[in-house]
Amino acid sequence: MSVTSREQKFSGKYSSYTAQDRQGLVNAVTCVLSSSSDPVAVSSDYSNSLSIAREVNAYAKIAGCDWTYYVQKLEVTIGRNTDSLNLNAVPGTVVKKNIDIDLGPAKIVSRKHAAIRFNLESGSWELQIFGRNGAKVNFRRIPTGPDSPPTVLQSGCIIDIGGVQMIFILPEQETIISDYCLNHLMPKLLSTYGTNGNNNPLLRNIIEGSTYLREQRLQEEARLQQLDHLHTPLSSSSDVNPIGDPHGDTIMMEEDEEDENYTRGGIRPNTYTSSSNNAVTNGNVPHIENPSDLSLDENRYIKPPQSYASMITQAILSTPEGSISLADIYKFISDNYAFYRFSQMAWQNSVRHNLSLNKAFEKVPKRAGQQGKGMNWKISDEVRRDFLNKWNAGKLSKIRRGASVTRQLQLHMSKFGEIPAPESSSIDPRGIKAQKVKKSLQATSSILGESAPQLQRTQLTGQISTTTSMDVTTNANVNNSSLS
């Protein structure tokens, strides 16, 4: 079937979205697919970094998180190549692999583990599994063995062999990723792209409508209710004045979507004492003390009363630059709270979810010369500016329940007289002192955007009896066209 336009029209579940939105979803899903803990050969053989602008004749595409294989024949083998191991001792030997997609050297993958074939009778692509450890398609185990029925592949199917996930894409079909797959991938999608879905309307709507996000928000609300009584000494003590104007006028500080992720389990500290010895010019700040040092090993069974948002804020404020990497946030929490240092639960996941969900935190580029990949985290410019403006105006009242980030900012400001900020921040913290500052701050909030890595653009045309033309451009989009 001939192609009359570069953008094929589809009438499927994503038809109301643009081709760019649909491709953005495929890109996002591909980038969060799992790979083996050890390097696999296909990641180097067909690495995305090796792609150059050129035309490729291909029937379809199979893509992992960091590699792309173009299907150029009617049968593709997947397995573990062993010839290169036997010929390494011969200098100058050119190794011709007998496997198309090499998932070695891990022996969990058989030498010939699977094959993807085009069935001329049915006109469909099928996956046959030979390896004893089997495989999954769309997160469900499929029949294994040479006599077992093959599994028909649709465009958007996610294949998992030996812990290496890959997505199968056809040009003649709309690439549909099943809801079941999206539910499995939702924690990674949310952690990587946030509730905004990397500014992709389709991905954003999928994340917002997910059961996972709804459950996360319900858990946050439940944890907030559990934390209510912890704030009672701070908000209702008769011998402590509320924080605000020295003349007694108070204005409640509003804050967007603060999340208190206090988790179940562990032993709560029994008593908390408040002291008015730390009064400052801007108001009396009660100092909350734990009954003992929670960093000591002996207190490993005592769950800290601080929420994850509070501990993240403490970690950020502990740095002179006001920004910190995710790994250093983990280290700060482990060093200061023995409960998490000895905990077997995946509390790091809760930290990542807080960073993604809480608008008080945002990413910032790492400092020049700072080691490690990824970005740093800081207090958002909007939250910092709102806090400092109200502090300088003397209009901070007693902290409302759930405002964990504000509480930590207030305690830090009372003790040190300033809030650290990274160089890229639009707010200059140097002029902020513990005394009431009459000069108002005028700053604009900088919003950092990150573009997700994208699949390579492929233009597929022609008949199944002949190979099809495919434009390959690094970090471009896939334009679905027609194959029959």
UniProtKB/Swiss-Prot annotation:
Q: Name one GO molecular function term.
A: DNA replication origin binding
- Matching SUPFAM superfamilies: SMAD/FHA domain (SSF49879), Winged helix' DNA-binding domain (SSF46785)
Annotated organism of origin: Saccharomyces cerevisiae (strain ATCC 204508 / S288c)
List where in the cell it is found: Nucleus; Cytoplasm, Cytosol
Instruction: Mention any additional remark.
Output: Present with 1720 molecules/cell in log phase SD medium.
- Look up keyword Nucleus and say if it applies: yes
Q: What does this protein do?
A: Transcription factor that regulates the expression of the CLB2 cluster of genes during the G2/M phase of the mitotic cell cycle. The CLB2 cluster of genes includes mitotic regulators such as CLB1, CLB2, CDC5 and CDC20 as well as SWI5 and ACE2, transcription factors required for the subsequent temporal wave of cell cycle regulated gene expression in the M/G1 phase interval. Involved in HMRa silencing.
GO cellular component: a single term: cytosol
DNA-binding interval(s) = 302-393
Tell me where in this chain the FHA domain is found.
Answer: 76-142
Per UniProt, subunit arrangement is: Interacts (via FHA domain) with ECM30, GLN3, URE2, MPH1 AND FDO1. Interacts with the origin recognition complex (ORC) composed of ORC1 to ORC6.
Some GO term, biological process aspect, for this entry: which one? regulation of transcription by RNA polymerase II
- Relate the outcome reported for changing S110A: Leads to reduced colony size when FKH2 is deleted
Task: Spell out the protein name for this chain.
Answer: Fork head protein homolog 1
Effect of deleting the gene: Causes only a modest decline in CLB2 cluster genes expression, but this expression is abolished when both FKH1 and FKH2 are deleted. Leads to a defect in silencing HMRa. Causes a form of yeast pseudohyphal growth, when FKH2 is also deleted. Affects cell-cycle progression and CLB2 mRNA expression. Leads to defect in pre-mRNA 3' end formation during transcription of targeted genes.
> Domain comment?
The phosphothreonine-binding FHA domain is required for the interaction with MPH1 and controlling recombination donor preference during mating-type switching.
Gene (UniProt): FKH1
Q: Keyword annotations for this protein? A: Cytoplasm, DNA-binding, Nucleus, Transcription, Transcription regulation
InterPro entries for this protein: FHA_dom, Fork_head_dom, SMAD_FHA_dom_sf, TF_fork_head_CS_1, TF_fork_head_CS_2, WH-like_DNA-bd_sf, WH_DNA-bd_sf
